[in-house]
Amino acid sequence: YLSEHNEDVILKLIKNNQLKFEEMFVAEPHVFICKDHPLAEKEMISMEDLRLYPYLVYEQGNNNSFYFSEEFISMLDFPKSIQVRDRATLFNLVIGLNGFTVSSGVIDQKLNGSSIIAKPLDVDKTMRIGIIKKKNIIFSRYASYYVEALRRHL
């Protein structure tokens, strides 16, 4: 995704490597929480609402910049944060610890079950979700089918 905090850096890297960002949709950030979370009944969740709960983020490794972070907001903004390496662990901690993570709001119940829900985050920011591909390259038939399937699903 591209956002106001990472767009300049990522687009420069894309350009320098003869790549192209193709936007699929624009999303407003959402909080992923357990359906039984104390904030689950709220229509919209504020940053202040989240301060009491652990923020779950993917470990980025020692050499990765925060510009490549999968999360939309910095873990520095929250007193409690836990780094995880995989989605299953993240969702188990969302459920077990009343934790949360922030993402696009796109969640598939067939893949993730019905225990995790997405609630809008009360921020005036957007995420431009897309794919990155080589410039001047035509997708194979299978790659084209895959991208079209993604578009239909989203």
Per-region residue spans from a language model:
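Secondary-structure junction motif
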Residues: 47, 51-76, 139-141
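Beta-alpha-beta core module
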Residues: 15-28, 89-138
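Extended ligand-binding regions for polar small-molecule ligands
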Residues: 48, 128, 132-154
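Short helix-loop capping/hinge motifs at secondary-structure junctions, enriched
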Residues: 36-45, 123-125, 136-142
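Flexible hinge/capping segments at coil-to-helix
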Residues: 14-29, 33-55
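Paired acidic/hydrophobic, glycine-rich loop segments that form the ligand-binding mouth/hinge
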Residues: 1-12, 99-104
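Short secondary-structure boundary segments
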Residues: 3-5, 35, 62, 104-107, ...
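A local structural motif
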Residues: 72-82, 116
